[in-house]
């Protein structure tokens, strides 16, 4: 029998798993959490700058069942191209929410917000690279 974990309960019966109740949020028109099922997300491997390849891969991933699709966006130029990808997918009738995956570049995250339904950021990477912010309790509030 698996040990109990704060996020779920288990029993001697392997099929008796109970999900932890999560807050309900909407990513585009696709709800996540609450009483909704676990959602399927996939990460694109096509270059985010190669619009044609990115859109073609999105069609394949979504037809396979993905409910969210993540693209990497390393900098502002790449994040801006998410807008082109988003527009082309919508023109083809595909409304699956797009997620920008950001590492080490707050400017790319801010740019991506203009074009996609969600931005995924590693919090430790979203920092003031010039070190101009003085961190204290007031800043964290």
Where are these regions (language model features)?
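Alpha/beta enzyme core
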Residues: 3-12, 17-71, 76-98, 102-141
């Amino acid at each position: 029998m698996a040990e109990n974990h704060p996020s779920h309960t288990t029993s001697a019966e392997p099929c008796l798993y109970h999900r932890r109740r999560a807050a309900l949020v909407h990513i585009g028109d696709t709800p996540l959490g609450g009483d909704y099922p676990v959602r399927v997300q996939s990460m694109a491997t096509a270059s985010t700058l190669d619009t044609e390849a990115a859109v073609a891969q999105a069609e394949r991933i979504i037809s396979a069942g993905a409910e969210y699709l993540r693209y990497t966006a390393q900098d502002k130029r790449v994040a801006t191209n998410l807008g082109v990808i988003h527009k082309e997918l919508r023109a083809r009738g595909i409304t699956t929410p797009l997620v920008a995956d950001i590492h080490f570049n707050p400017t790319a995250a801010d740019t991506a917000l203009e074009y996609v339904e969600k931005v995924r950021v590693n919090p430790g990477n979203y920092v003031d690279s010039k070190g101009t912010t003085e961190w204290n309790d007031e800043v964290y509030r």
